[in-house]
Amino acid sequence: MLQRIRLNLEAVEAMLYYWQAASEKDNIAESFFYDVAKMPALSAAYDEEFDGESVRRALSAIKNRERFDGNKKEKKFWNNNMWMMEDLEYTRSMANPLKKLNLDSLVSELQGTPGSDKIEEVEVIFSPLHSDEYIISGNRLIVNFFRIKPNDVDEKAYIGEKELKLYIKEKIEELLQK
C-alpha cells in the first residue's frame, strides 16, 4: 500500500550550483560532470543517443565556452543548460516552488487508485532532461526540470497548463497503473 511520496531534488541542486559557477566562470572539476552523469535522475533518460558521456561533453563544453556538436538529444540538453545560465533569476524562480513542494497530502488522495496497493513508496525526481517531459521507471517519476513554468503572481509552478502538484498526482496515477 502506498505510504510515502519522496521528493528528490539532488540533480536540480547540483545543476543550480553548476549554472551559477559556469556563468561566473568559476572552475568546475571534471569529476563533477561524471558525478552528475551517474545520478539516477539523469541516467534514467539514457539510450543509444544520449548517455553519461553526452552529459559530460555538453556540460564541459559550456564550462569551457566551446562550440558543441552532437546529436539532436545532446544539442537539446546543451541548449537547455545554456538557457538556464542566461537568466539565473528565472532559473531560481523555477527551482523555488520545488523547494517548498510538499507531496504528503497526495498519499491519502492516491489511496484507492488502482495499483496503489502494490507500491509502498514513490520517488518524484526533478531532473534536467533533454526532451522528455517525464519518465516513469519502476517506482520513480522523473520530471523534466526544464518544463517548469513559474508564476510570479502566486509563486506556484506549472507544467504546460497544469499546476505542478496536480500534474504530479496525475503522473503518479499513471505510474501506479503500470
Report residues per predicted region.
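Auxiliary, metal-adjacent structural segments of Zn-dependent hydrolase domains
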Residues: N80-P150
